[in-house]
Structures are given as C-alpha cells and as structure tokens.
C-alpha cells in the first residue's frame, strides 16, 4: 500500500550513524493530478534515507532559512533494490507492513544510478531486522505544498475499518458475495426508475451530510431505496461509491486503449475500435461495471427532453469518475508537456478532461450497438467469472500470492508510464491503479491493527462455494503458465480464495503468465501468532500488481502444482482444438466459394470466346463485301464478274450507270439550248427594223421558249420514267448478261420517245445501249448522291428559266423605247 503521507520531523543523522552516500536524486511531486520531478539532496545511512531541499553541508541559506529534513524512509534488512536502466529509475522495495512499500527515485546519470544501487544494497545489508524495528510505517514525506494535507490521514484513520458500501473491490461493486444486488446496483436501478425525469440529475449536487447519512443508514439495515427519496442524493451516492473504489473503474491501460481508439478520424471505424478496446483490454469485472454505468447513463440521456441531461452533459459529470487514470496524467497526451509551469499543467489537465468527456460521450451514443455486440453482451453475473479485476482488494492473512524477488528485476513499470513524467516516486500500494492523490482516502484498511480478525473479509467470502481456480481464470489465460506453486489449502482459506481474484501481472493488461500460489497448511493457532507470521514475511511487487503475503514455511505440495498445471494445459488444448475446428470450417467455406468463383469465371471465358469467334466471322464478311464493292466501283459493268457480288449489287450498279448517263445527257442538252438561245437573242436584236418585226420577234421568242421548256420537261419526264421502269428491268438483266438483252427494248410511253423529245435516234440509241451494258457498281451512298444531283438540276433549271424571262423583259423594254423614238411626229 502507499506509504503514509503524514508529516513528521526527523533528527539529523548522528555521528554514530554512518553515511554511506549523499547526493542529488529526483523525486516525484504531485500537482493537479500530474506528476513531475524535483531535484533534492539525499543522505543514506544504515537506518534511513532522508532528503533535504539543498545540501545540508553547504553554506547557510539566505535570510537565515533552515534546511530542514523534508522526508525519508526507514530502512530494514527486508528491503531490496530494483534498477531500470532505460529511465534511470531506482526503486526500493519492502515486503514488511500489510501490503509492502515501494519507493521510486530517479538518478541523473547511469553512473549515479549504479552508485546509489550499490550504496543502498550495502545499507540494507547493515540495516536493522524488520521484526525488531518499531513502527514500520515506511514514512516517505514530501513537501507540504505538493502533498495532501495531514488532515486527510487523520480523517482516514477515523473511518470504519470495514464498510459494506464504500471501498469495496470492483469484483463486488455490483453484487454481494451471495449474488444479491449491492448498494451501487440498487442505486443505479433507483435512478433508472425514478431519476430519469428529474431535471439536472447527476449534475446537481446534494448535501454531503445527507449522502453520508444515507450510506450509514444502508450499513445499519435500510437496504432498499424508497420512491420518496431524493434522486439527487442517490445520484451523489453513486458518485461517492465510484470515487471511493480502491481502483479506477477503467484501468490505466484500458484508458490508453480507449484514447488510442478515439483518435481515429472515421466515425464508424472509431466506434468499432472502441468496442474492440473494451472487449480485448478490459478485465471482466471492469467491463461489467463500465457497461452497467453506461446503461444507467444511457437511460438518463434517453429522457433528455425532460431532465435536460444530454450525452455530453452526463459524460462531463461521470467521466472523471470512470476514467480516473486519464485525468491523473497516466495516459500519454500528445502535444502537452506536463513538466511545464502551472499554465501548461492546467492546459494538460483541461485536455485530459475534454478527452475523457469525448470518450464517454462516444460510448453513450454507441451504447445500443455495444450491448448487441456478442463480446460485450456476454457478461456473466456469477462470481466465478469475475477473475479479471484490476483493482486491489482488501488484504487478508489467508490469501497468499507470492511474487518472487528475482522476478522483480525483470519487470517493467506499468504500461501507462510512457515517459519520465508519468513515473510515480512516492511510495504506493503495488496494486494501486492510478496516482490519484485521494485514492488513499478511500482505502478502508486498518493501520497497525493487523491482529484483528474482523479486518479480513474472510468471513464474508466463506459463503461462496469453493471452485477450481482454473475454471475461473480460463478466459484470461493467453500464454502458458510458466511457474506455479500450489500448496494445500484449509477449508476456510479455500472458501475465501474462491471468491477472490488474482492478478500477479504488473499491469492490468498483462496476461496471467507467472502465477505462484502458496497457502498456509494450517489455520492460525491464535490471532497473535497469525499476525506475527504475517509481519515476518511479506511479498513485494512492482507497479500495479497485487502485493500479497508469503506463505508459512514448509507448506509446498508438488502434486497440487502438477494437477493445476495439467488442468490448465488441458483447457488450453481444448480451446486450441475449438479454434482449429472453427478455422477449418471457415477455410472450407472459403474453399467452396473459391471453387464457385472459378467455375463462373470458366463459363464466362467460354462465352467470351464464342462471342469473339462470331464477331470475327462478321468482320471477315464485312471485309469481303467491302472488297467486292471497291472492285465493282473500279470496273465497268461489262468487266464486272458475276462471282464478285450478288444480283442485288449488280442491279444497283446498273441503275447508277443509267442515272449518270442521263445526267450527262441532260447537262449536254442544257448547254446546247443555252447556246441556241444566246444565238437567237443576238440575231433578233440585230435584225429588228421596226415595232412590227419586234412584235413578231417576241411572239417567235415566246414560242421557242415554250418549246424549250416543253423539251426540258420531256427530258426530265423521260428520266423519271426510266427510273420507274428500272424495277421492271430487273427480271431482264439476267438475259442481258447472257447476251439476249440486246434484242429487247424498254417499253415506254408513246409520248416519251426519242422523236417527241427531239433527240436523234442515232444519239438516243447509244445512250440507251450504254445504260444497259455499261453499268458501274453502286452503293447506297451513290444512290443518295444521284438523288441530290437530280434535285440540283431541277433547281438549276428553275434558275435558268428565271434568267431567260428576265432577259425577255429587258429585251421588251429596250424595244419599246426604240419604237417610241422612231415614231412619226404626228403620233
């Protein structure tokens, strides 16, 4: 347990007391829950290690200031020294007292570290025997401005030695040893029933005297909460019980895990990480207590419209009680230096409080998912499953767990100590979960009253049925047990141990890998004998491990050791078999899924191969068609091979040839007509003598114009008629290719023959023959081009007719003016 902080005065070391070494060392100083190091001058003698603010042998202080002794340690021969090189830490361990003492100092250099180690070992070898030293309180006093006032110690000494409400281990926080609800559980149920509609519940404080009175009434027999009670008083009772737990509801290593999980940016990933941290790092009793508190808080926040307590408000009230190590400075917060001045420490403390509130808020908002989680929902209410408690329990003369001294040299300080700032120098209880300055305030163990049988919870635990310890800790075994020593246990002691937890590891997160159990072979003959035996031998531990007492001499049973080891190995074997079977089942499912995937891919590959083959065939066919069309366009109809393309393609080529011949003939006819018109116009302009001849010219010109228009329309009608008749000629084209088509003539309208169009027969026949024997190849694009050309010719014809009419009008106006000028004067 942590050494008493009561202030005492020590005399200066006498001349007869040899000084083994003197020099500077660093001690820890507490302020605002944060640890820092201060340099002090230490003097080591055979009986004590005292320290001063400055070197006492130096010059007198300014202004006549007296350099008094600030504190010290009483030495005895049972002490040992542990060195940690990486942080230059020096720890003095004493197994004497109820739970042992541990004092941590820090050297400036490694040379100083080993010099102090050698000097301490020499002094401890010459120190008085522990059994002969009077008043083994192990006082290690610190400066008054950095410690809790001595009034706390006197207040603590006046507390009852044992309470059924406060100061109980986390294992018994929610239920009594017989399975009935505890004070805390009943208070939580009351708040869930009657406190959800009370405004400011958990935030508004009640009178301290009423809270103390209600706790005393419960201890005196009033074990039920009535609906008439003040919910604010009950809420403060819950806070009071949590505040006075011997250890934090959430251990330091678990706080660190929650803090790391909360740093994740994505909300979903952060929630999953928080759940995993609770499942993997929390001991079973701590997890049950945290989930129970979250359930009550979630119920309160679900009625926030009535009580005005949101998740953030409830988290602000309860996070300092649940995440005690985080606010005590045991978790590494990046970007904040706890060794700075008061303002830096205030900022660090505020940041820690904000992080704690944010973590609890996130847990409250995700409470529904966590309850539905298989790992979190599997919380047994049996005391046999509560083996993972990280907090200390009331020491007992019958519970004996030995952590041998050689192992202490290989142990590390708790995981939460990430730097020198978090190493605690003050002596403390080895099982203490945090450096919370007031934690000693809530430890209701007797001081110096070790011979009282009423101080042991043995009588309470005797009502629990004795069970095999391996069955209770099987879920916490993660590594093989390396060294187990078990001796026979008396019925009373076995009954007591069955309801207890055992954590021999240094940190709450360390697996149970080195358990050493020894118990007394016989009951104490008397209270005095049991007390003297306990005082003579004590176990020592380092950091956060539980410090328990050594067994009586000569009480080892190798058969029990082998039996327990065999049982645990069998359990591990069964668990490994189950894991192997589970993995094999999962692998079989994955293998089946892989086979299905392979089959689907094979079928898909075959389908794609078929599609590729079909598309290649289509591509080849299109290429062949393109080649045939290109060949057809490059040769004449007579040279076109019948094997190069089908009948449809040949018909299109012939039709295109006819259309091109018609267009060429029309162009020639238009050119001839235009030339004739120009000649006639010039002739008439030069040969008109008078108005009568001019009138005759206009009449003849109009007649010729009409004849020209009729001829042009006849030509276009002939072309259209030819296009309509080409459909009928399809059946005759086979005969034309065999040579029989030369004797046939295309039927036509009697009005649309060569004579009616004014075309000589010798000119018309070659055109027709050319159209029937020299048909170039064609495509759909060529047909569209032909249609476009015909439309263009129509538009061109209209333009020419308009030009001819304009010329006629101009010619008429000029002739009229000439006629008026040549008229006789009498007109």
From Swiss-Prot:
GO terms for biological process: cell plate formation involved in plant-type cell wall biogenesis; signal transduction. Residues 560-684 form a coiled coil. Residues 379-437, 517-561 are annotated as: Disordered. Keywords: Coiled coil, GTPase activation. This is Rho GTPase-activating protein 6. Residues 517-543 have a biased composition (Polar residues). SUPFAM superfamilies: GTPase activation domain, GAP (SSF48350), PH domain-like (SSF50729). GO terms for molecular function: GTPase activator activity. SMART domains: PH, RhoGAP. The gene is ROPGAP6. It comes from the Eukaryota. The record marks 203 as: Arginine finger.
């Amino acid at each position: 347990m942590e050494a008493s902080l009561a202030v005492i005065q020590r005399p200066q070391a006498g001349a007869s007391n040899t000084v083994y070494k003197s020099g500077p060392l660093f001690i820890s100083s507490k302020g605002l829950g944060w640890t820092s190091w201060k340099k002090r001058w230490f003097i080591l003698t055979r009986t004590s290690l005292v320290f001063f603010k400055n070197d006492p042998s130096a010059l007198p202080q300014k202004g006549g200031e007296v350099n008094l002794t600030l504190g010290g340690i009483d030495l005895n021969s049972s002490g040992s020294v542990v060195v940690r090189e990486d942080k230059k830490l020096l720890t003095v361990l004493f197994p004497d007292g109820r739970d042992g003492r541990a004092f941590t100092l820090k050297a400036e250099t490694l040379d100083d570290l080993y010099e102090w180690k050698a000097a301490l070992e020499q002094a401890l070898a010459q120190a008085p025997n522990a059994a002969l030293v009077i008043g083994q309180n192990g006082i290690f006093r610190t400066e008054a401005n950095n410690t809790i006032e001595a009034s706390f110690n006197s207040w603590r000494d006046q507390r009852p030695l044992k309470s059924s409400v406060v100061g109980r281990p986390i294992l018994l926080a929610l239920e009594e040893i017989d399975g009935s609800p505890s004070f805390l559980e009943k208070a939580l149920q009351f708040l869930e029933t009657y406190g959800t509609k009370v405004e400011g519940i958990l935030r508004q404080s009640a009178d301290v005297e009423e809270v103390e009175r209600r706790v005393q009434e419960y201890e005196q027999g009033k074990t039920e909460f009535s609906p008439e009670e003040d919910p604010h008083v009950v809420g403060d009772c819950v806070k009071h019980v949590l505040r006075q737990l011997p250890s934090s509801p959430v251990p330091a290593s678990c706080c660190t895990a929650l803090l790391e999980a909360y740093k994740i940016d994505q909300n979903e990933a952060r929630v999953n990480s928080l759940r995993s941290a609770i499942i993997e790092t929390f001991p079973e009793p701590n997890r049950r207590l945290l989930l129970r508190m979250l359930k009550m808080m979630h119920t309160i926040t679900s009625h926030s419209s009535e009580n005005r307590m949101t998740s953030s408000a409830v988290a602000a009230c309860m996070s300092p009680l649940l995440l005690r190590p985080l606010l005590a400075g045991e978790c590494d917060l990046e970007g904040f230096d706890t060794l700075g001045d008061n303002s830096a420490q205030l900022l660090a403390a505020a940041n820690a409080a904000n992080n704690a509130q944010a973590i609890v808020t996130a847990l409250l908002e995700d409470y529904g998912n966590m309850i539905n989680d298989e790992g979190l929902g599997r919380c047994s209410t049996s005391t046999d499953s509560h083996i993972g408690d990280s907090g200390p329990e009331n020491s007992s003369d019958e519970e004996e767990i030995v952590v041998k001294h050689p192992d202490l040299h290989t142990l590390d300080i708790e995981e939460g100590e990430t730097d020198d700032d978090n190493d605690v120098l003050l002596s403390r209880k080895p099982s203490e979960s945090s450096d919370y300055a007031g934690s000693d305030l809530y430890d209701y163990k007797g001081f110096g009253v070790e011979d009282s049988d009423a101080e042991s919870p043995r009588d309470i635990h005797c009502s629990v049925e004795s069970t095999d310890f391996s069955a209770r800790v099987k879920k916490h075994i993660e590594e093989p047990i390396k060294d187990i020593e078990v001796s026979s246990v008396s019925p009373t002691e076995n009954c007591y141990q069955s309801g207890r937890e055992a954590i021999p590891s240094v940190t709450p997160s360390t697996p149970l890998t080195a358990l050493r159990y020894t118990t007394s072979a016989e009951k104490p003959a008397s209270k005095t004998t049991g007390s003297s035996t306990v005082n003579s031998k004590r176990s020592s531990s380092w950091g956060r491990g539980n410090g328990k007492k050594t067994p009586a001499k000569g009480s080892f049973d190798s058969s029990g050791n082998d039996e327990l080891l065999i049982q645990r190995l069998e359990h591990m074997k069964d668990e490994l078999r189950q894991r192997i079977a589970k993995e094999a089942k999962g692998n079989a499912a994955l293998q089946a899924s892989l086979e299905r995937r392979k089959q689907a891919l094979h079928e898909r590959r075959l389908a794609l191969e078929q599609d590729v083959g079909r598309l290649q065939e289509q591509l080849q066919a299109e290429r062949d068609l393109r080649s045939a069309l290109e060949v057809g366009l490059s040769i004449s109809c007579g040279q076109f091979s019948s094997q190069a393309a089908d009948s449809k393609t040949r018909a299109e080529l012939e039709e295109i040839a006819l259309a091109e011949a018609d267009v060429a003939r029309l162009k020639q006819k238009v050119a001839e007509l235009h030339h004739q018109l120009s000649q006639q116009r010039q002739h008439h302009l030069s040969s008109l003598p008078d108005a009568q001849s001019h009138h005759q010219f206009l009449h003849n010109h109009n007649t010729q114009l009409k004849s020209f228009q009729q001829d042009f329309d006849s030509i276009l009608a002939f072309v259209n008629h030819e296009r309509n008749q080409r459909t009928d000629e399809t059946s005759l084209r086979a005969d034309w290719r065999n040579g029989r088509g030369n004797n046939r003539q295309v039927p036509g309208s009697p009005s649309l023959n060569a004579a009616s169009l004014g075309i000589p027969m010798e000119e018309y026949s070659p055109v027709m023959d050319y159209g029937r024997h020299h048909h170039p190849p064609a495509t759909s694009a060529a047909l569209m081009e032909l249609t476009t050309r015909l439309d263009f010719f129509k538009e061109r014809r209209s333009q020419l007719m308009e030009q001819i009419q304009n010329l006629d009008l101009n010619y008429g106006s000029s002739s009229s003016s000439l006629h008026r000028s040549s008229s006789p004067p009498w007109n």
